[in-house]
Curated annotation (Swiss-Prot):
Glycans are attached at residue 47. The keyword Cell wall biogenesis/degradation does not apply. It is found in: Secreted. Coiled coil: none annotated. Belongs to the UPF0669 family. This is UPF0669 protein C6orf120 homolog. It comes from Gallus gallus. InterPro entries: UPF0669 (IPR031420).
Amino acid sequence: MAARWRRILIVFVAAQVLCLVNTFEEEDVPEEWILLHVVQGQIGAGNYSYLRLNHEGKIVLQMQSLKGDADLYVSDMTLHPSFDEYELQSVTCGQDIVHVPAHFRRPVGIGIYGHPSHQESEFEMKVYYDRTVVQYPFGEASYNPEEMEANQKYSHSTEDESQDEESVFWTVLIGILKLILEILF
């Protein structure tokens, strides 16, 4: 009877150890994500810490609040994003994730805010390059901001060139007609 209880106790302890190990194990990330940087820091309550992102392409910012609560604000318009001025944000208690699209202008401003509910917050942010290829359900006809911007620049330049050519043509034609009218009259 004692041997049976001993086996049950050993199985129970082993299960507890496995659960404990799994909770401390690194979080799984997709194979397509390549780790570029790991940034650790501390931030006081109500303060900001600013970082700059220069890497091109799709970037994933994964921040874990180790102590306290740090929030994440991202912008391609300003290098000092805040809770008043940002394009992307993640303000959860614990893990914050922001996906920075490839079309964002570089450098991208990253603001880390220490929530006032804690005197000091500690964070660890992992910066990943996302190599996933997006499959658009409508193929080439789908919206691609980078391609649209390039096409708009091309169409504006061809319109400007044709307007310039027309303008020069009409200027020369009017000049010749004025010359003919002066000679005749």
